[in-house]
């Protein structure tokens, strides 16, 4: 068993996060326990709680790292040079491929429920929102007549649709389909949604039948 002095506070923190992510990838998030993490890094369970408040806090930081990786992929230089329609298609493809490549860490963002009722910290909420901001910024040039709130609503609607297709595909609720089929469904959703979103100009979105 390693001594606490063998590693700095930050080193232990990074070791815990890496070990926890490895367990999630191998066993799913249901397999994650403080005891397993401690065993993997060679420290006591008590050491984990010197760097994280509790298991919920650890999971939130794991989710933050997952969101960071997703954000980095979505802001890759290649996507920023595309036309808005093409960029939205690419963003959808990136999201679905990310989910299929790392399904357990991806699912943990949405499936974990903290044991207390404390609100989401601002630093974590910012990581969630900046993913939506990318979609909002890409949508805006396609419909300059839309208000800021309509753009935000559209970004949420598109994400919800793509996310739903992704969940149904990964959990095999669409039958025995693979990532390619899910990608095609997402493309169809984006094409049809954008057609209505860009062309209906004279009425508020809530009154549209797109």
Region roles according to the model:
Residues 12-20, 37, 62-66, 70, ...:
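Generic hydrophobic, amphipathic alpha-helix propensity
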Residues 15, 23-57, 61:
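Helix-turn-helix
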Residues 118-144, 152-156, 184-195:
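Amphipathic alpha-helical packing segments from all-alpha helical-bundle domains
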Residues 101-119, 167-175:
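Amphipathic alpha-helical segments used for helix-helix packing
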Residues 75-104, 129, 145-148, 154-158:
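Hydrophobic alpha-helical connector segments
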Residues 64-88, 120, 129-131, 137-141:
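Amphipathic alpha-helical linker/stalk segments
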Residues 158-177, 192-203:
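Amphipathic C-terminal alpha-helical segment
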Residues 1-11, 81, 201-210:
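N-terminal intrinsically disordered/low-complexity leader segments
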């Amino acid at each position: 068993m390693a001594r606490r002095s063998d590693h700095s506070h930050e080193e232990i923190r990074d070791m815990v996060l890496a070990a926890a992510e490895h367990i999630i990838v191998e066993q799913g998030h249901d397999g994650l326990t403080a005891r397993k993490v401690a065993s993997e890094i060679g420290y006591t369970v008590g050491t984990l709680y010197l760097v994280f408040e509790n298991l919920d806090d650890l999971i939130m930081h794991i989710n933050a790292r997952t969101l960071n990786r997703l954000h980095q992929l979505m802001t890759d230089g290649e996507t920023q040079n595309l036309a808005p329609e093409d960029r939205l298609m690419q963003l959808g493809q990136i999201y679905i491929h990310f989910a299929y490549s790392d399904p357990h860490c991806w699912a943990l963002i949405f499936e974990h429920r903290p044991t207390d009722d404390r609100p989401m910290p601002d630093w974590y909420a910012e990581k969630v929102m900046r993913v939506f901001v990318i979609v909002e910024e890409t949508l805006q040039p396609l419909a300059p007549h839309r208000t800021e709130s309509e753009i935000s609503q559209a970004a949420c609607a598109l994400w919800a649709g793509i996310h739903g297709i992704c969940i149904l595909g990964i959990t095999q609720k669409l039958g025995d389909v693979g990532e390619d089929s899910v990608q095609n469904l997402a493309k169809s959703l984006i094409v049809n949604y954008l057609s209505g979103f860009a062309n209906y100009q004279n009425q508020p979105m809530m009154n549209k039948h797109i």
